[in-house]
Amino acid sequence: MTDFSPREIVSELDRFIVGQHDAKRAVAIALRNRWRRLRLEGSMRDEVLPKNILMIGPTGCGKTEISRRLAKMAGAPFLKVEATKFTEIGYVGRDVEQIVRDLVETAISMIKEDKRKLVRAKAELAAEDRILDALVGPGASPPTRDSFRKKLRAGELEDKEIEVEIAQGSGGAMPMFELPNMPGAQIGAMSLGDMFGKAFGKGGKPRRMSVKDAVEPLITEEGDKLMDQDVIVREAIVEVENNGIVFLDEIDKICVREGSRGGADVSREGVQRDLLPLIEGANVPTKHGVVKTDHILFIASGAFHVSKPSDLLPELQGRLPIRVELAPLTEDDFRRILTDTEASLLKQYEALMRTEGVELSFTPDAVNALAKIAAQVNSSVENIGARRLQTVMERVLDEISFSATDRFGEKIEIDAAYVEQHIGDLARNADLSRFIL
């Protein structure tokens, strides 16, 4: 769990996301409160519940990006899901309890990754021994093994083909099966796979591959042998229960509008009802054990173009007490997105062209022109936020991207006149913009 202060979290988010200060503050405080709660003693720790957040704002204003960046910073189990992917329990499809199951799997992967780093040195030695067994045989004399070990460490044997037996599923997740009209059917399928795996020793058939390709799978397999899987699962469940964060995107799409009560609307309302106990706190059975959701933080977000937050079930509104409105992006915001963010679009295109030996640069007036056109098209056609910049940039740089291979060593400067020439007329014609931009 990260121990960043709220100010540090906001500062980190500022590196990648322009504006939306209220939303950044809300998630920063929520994240810090997780850290504060873990430092409380006894019953008080159980009483302090997370204050779930509802982010409201038009598409492309930074809601999902805030969640993506927060996931990288949190150092905690984090899951982003679309509310539209779920159906009411009893209907065909995934039920909302799958959120908790997926969160547990995420936590297990995180903890395994951390523990693999701790045992990597031992795992590398064990993997090296298995590669040597495949190269010279287990009965080879010590001098022969030492000779080949030196060559292996020097990288001289990387292209050599060997036959090794790697357990199925080593380093990867077991395939999951969906059974229609059976809530939680994925668990049954996974458990069945586990049972057969244990019964038959989870052995894999011998595979031929180069030494270079065999190294990582063997290190992963040997590392897994050195870890206690039961301890990992227990730690993962504790981590999910205390630090888990779920980002529920597109929650406005499961709203039931006033006066509308069709078949699909009934199902949407059912998903909301199923979410209530999950957000309030429930015991969810998973293949690894029961998980309590009382202290999982839920951050919901939606554009609410057609519906409004009050169209959500009153009980669900009550379980999302902190509301944050994200402002639509202005021309000035677009300008800052193009220049101020750490991996801005301009830097990305310059780096891409550099791989072809082309030095691409943008003048300040070109940046102003790009921002102005993006804002104009958003206001006249459909406001899709920062995503409009990508469409505009692709259109402006279409010719350069296509011919870059033939222009090695050239220096190309994009100015306002170039932008106007390639996209100006298109942006001014609202009918054309509707279809092309």
From Swiss-Prot:
It comes from Methylocella silvestris (strain DSM 15510 / CIP 108128 / LMG 27833 / NCIMB 13906 / BL2). A double ring-shaped homohexamer of HslV is capped on each side by a ring-shaped HslU homohexamer. The assembly of the HslU/HslV complex is dependent on binding of ATP. One of its GO terms (biological process) is protein unfolding. Pfam families: AAA, AAA_2. The keyword Cytoplasm applies. Its main location: cytoplasm. Transmembrane segments: none annotated. Belongs to the ClpX chaperone family. HslU subfamily. GO terms for cellular component: HslUV protease complex. ATPase subunit of a proteasome-like degradation complex; this subunit has chaperone activity. The binding of ATP and its subsequent hydrolysis by HslU are essential for unfolding of protein substrates subsequently hydrolyzed by HslV. HslU recognizes the N-terminal part of its protein substrates and unfolds these before they are guided to HslV for hydrolysis. Keywords: ATP-binding, Chaperone, Cytoplasm, Nucleotide-binding, Stress response. HAMAP family: HslU (MF_00249). GO terms for molecular function: ATP binding; ATP hydrolysis activity; peptidase activity; proteasome-activating activity. It is found in: Cytoplasm. The gene is hslU. This is ATP-dependent protease ATPase subunit HslU. The lineage of its organism: Bacteria, Pseudomonadati, Pseudomonadota, Alphaproteobacteria, Hyphomicrobiales. ATP binds at residues 18, 60-65, 249, 315, 387. InterPro entries: AAA+_ATPase (IPR003593), ATP-dep_Clp_protease_ClpX (IPR050052), ATPase_AAA_core (IPR003959), Clp_ATPase_C (IPR019489), HslU (IPR004491), P-loop_NTPase (IPR027417).
